[in-house]
Regions:
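Acidic/charged, solvent-exposed loop-and-adjacent secondary-structure segments enriched in E/D, K/R, S/T
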Residues: 87, 91-107
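Anionic-ligand-binding alpha/beta catalytic cores of soluble enzymes and soluble regulatory domains
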Residues: 104-111, 127-128
């Protein structure tokens, strides 16, 4: 993906999704700022999530996020214990044990959950998400189909908006219908103004891992 900040190119991002065995997944996301941007405000972000698909539902097992600001490195980790019904959450600000119920996900696995629900035609109105050491409820809305002009040509998409509980931040996703609802554009808005956008640049497919 190409990364834009307030309409200007500021870096790139790489998303990797691997199928593990018959029902497992490993998802990775990395944001790399351009060298000049990194000198001014370095925010190299790496996220990874792993889990499994059961009865069409995404069940995350672990999530790790590492943010390098140039001055310090911050890390957040979530471990999902489904048999015990608990989430062990740890960040630089502290740690907590949170209750775990069906449908709860992490920030990265949320993408996979929406992709799966769109394929099944069963997109809910909200998702329960753990970010840091706090559970949050995000409102989800299907805003209909839209054809995008991308680096890979015209792509038919479904536009889906995700709004934070406080309503101050909305993220809009465009999921490609013909590519199993892979996100081809992601735009973040604060108080109605776009501050970040990802545009797909290339797509590679490989055989599933055992």
């Amino acid at each position: 993906y190409d990364l834009y900040g307030s309409g200007l190119p500021v870096g790139e991002a790489l998303m990797t999704l691997d199928a593990i065995g018959s029902n497992g997944y490993a998802l990775r996301f990395e944001v790399r700022p351009h060298p000049l941007v990194a000198l001014l405000a370095s925010h190299h972000i790496q996220e990874q999530a792993s889990g499994e698909l059961r009865d069409g539902q995404v069940r995350p097992l672990e999530y790790i996020r590492q943010t390098d600001t140039g001055r310090e490195t911050q890390q957040a980790q979530l471990r999902f214990d489904w048999p015990a019904g608990q989430i062990a959450a740890q960040t630089h600000a502290g740690s907590a044990m949170l209750p775990l119920s069906p449908g709860v996900t992490d920030p990265l696995s949320l993408n996979l959950a929406v992709m799966s629900d769109l394929q099944r035609g069963q997109l809910p109105e909200q998702y329960a998400l753990v970010d840091g050491i706090e559970p949050r409820i995000y409102r989800i809305r299907n805003e209909g189909e839209e054809t995008l002009k991308t680096a890979l040509g015209p792509v038919r998409t479904v536009r889906v908006s995700q709004t934070r509980p406080d309503g101050n931040r909305t993220t809009i996703f465009w999921f490609a219908i013909e590519w199993q609802y892979l996100p081809v554009r992601i735009a973040r808005q604060k108080k109605g103004r776009e501050d970040l956008r990802l545009e797909i640049r290339s797509l590679e497919r490989s055989a599933p891992r055992n």
